[in-house]
A protein has these predicted regions:
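Short amphipathic alpha-helical signal-transduction/dimerization elements
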Residues: 253, 303-310, 314
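A conserved helix-loop-beta module that forms one wall/lid of the active-site cleft
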Residues: 86-158
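C-terminal active-site "lid" helix and adjoining low-complexity regulatory extension at the edge
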Residues: 18, 39, 230, 240, ...
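Phosphate-binding core of ATP-grasp and ATP-grasp-like enzymes
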Residues: 178-187, 192-235, 243-264, 268-276, ...
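Long amphipathic alpha-helical segments used for membrane anchoring, targeting, substrate engagement
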Residues: 310-333
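ATP-binding N-terminal substructure of ATP-dependent carboxylate-amine bond-forming enzymes
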Residues: 1-97, 102, 128, 306
Length: 333
């Protein structure tokens, strides 16, 4: 029987997923709140609906009798996806796991409990509270929204760098307000700034096995906001450094407890140690997961994520998942 996949969001970043699922013989229902979303035209069925509404999407999913749901390259409806998986008994992350994977404070707590390396992090109460906490730091800091994706609202605050003027209290408060306005739950984290190169780690979790596909070197602009400008695969860093990044990412994924999904981890290296910035339980954006990873590794990450979602077991799926275990997995962590 033909599998039925619900794709939450149908923008330009979701088009490769919609097209790939159709190539795999899956019936695709694409949902987006924008009737002009470019991906809707490629689906077998297009639904214009508020994809952030759990009740609306639960109703649509039941009517469509879906076998799986995927929310690629975006986080706005992760809670919805988790709720659908729970209510309909589907493969993938739960609602609780979705919340943990989209709330940076809860994520940091999970990392700490799971011994996954990450920076010192404080959930602040106000700009004044954040400033007082910052005054106790012996390093520079980062202000970031507790709930948001990408680099929106993130800013470096300077305290100890001799090459720059320290951030004034007035400027600190302005940056805090920007982070607060960008946070979907109106809370802001103050974190230790990790000085060093930035990376992402592309992962597929399949039946409890955490499979690392590759490590991506990232190029960003300078402080204070760190917008991504480019990506390189495979990593140009040493094998030892790459293994440290992989190990940190695997520990982080296991700390979050997610299963049968793609993961996009972000990390930095400082003084030879890997630090996790965050992990998204989804395909990464900027065409890293949907295009670049396939080109550099030969592994179709989109197909693998879809297979994990709908649990499609056929010759194509087995071949793709077989590639994942070809020396890319890091067991025992």
């Amino acid at each position: 029987m033909q599998k039925r996949l619900l794709v939450l969001a149908a923008g330009i970043l979701q088009v490769p997923v919609i097209k790939k699922a159709k190539e795999m013989g899956i019936y695709v229902i694409a949902a987006d709140g924008d009737k002009n979303a470019v991906g809707l035209q490629y689906a077998d069925k297009a639904i214009v609906v508020n994809i952030t509404s759990e009740e609306d999407m639960l109703r649509e999913a039941r009517e469509e009798k879906i076998d799986g749901v995927i929310h690629p390259c975006s986080e706005v409806s992760m809670n919805v996806m988790g709720r659908l998986n729970e209510e309909l008994g589907l493969s993938g992350i739960t609602r609780e796991q979705a919340i943990r994977a989209t709330n940076k404070h809860l994520m940091r707590e999970a990392f700490e409990k799971g011994n996954a390396p990450s920076p010192k992090s404080i959930l602040t109460k106000s700009a004044e509270d954040a400033w007082e906490q910052f005054m106790t730091f012996e390093c520079d800091g980062i202000l970031k929204p507790s709930r948001n994706s990408g680099s929106r609202g993130i800013a470096k605050v300077i305290k100890t760098n001799p090459n720059f003027t320290n951030t004034s209290k007035e400027e600190f408060s302005k940056l805090y307000d920007i982070a607060l306005n960008e946070s979907r739950d109106k809370s802001v984290l103050l974190e230790q700034f990790i000085e060093g190169p930035e990376f992402s780690i592309e992962i597929i979790v399949w039946d409890g096995q955490v499979n690392v596909l590759t490590v991506t070197d990232k190029k960003t602009n300078e402080a204070p906001h760190f917008v991504e400008l480019g990506h390189n695969q495979p990593s140009c860093y040493s094998a030892e450094e790459v293994e440290k990044l992989k190990a940190a990412a695997v520990a982080g994924v296991k700390a979050l407890g997610v299963n049968n999904c793609a993961c996009h981890a972000e990390a930095k290296l400082q003084n030879g140690k890997a630090y996790l910035m965050e992990i998204g339980a989804r395909l990464g954006g900027d065409f890293i997961s949907t295009e670049l990873t396939h080109l550099s590794t030969g592994v179709d990450m989109v197909a693998a994520a879809i297979n994990a979602t709908v649990k499609q077991v056929d010759e194509t799926a087995e071949a793709e998942m077989g590639k994942l275990t070809g020396g890319l997995n890091i067991p025992g962590l």
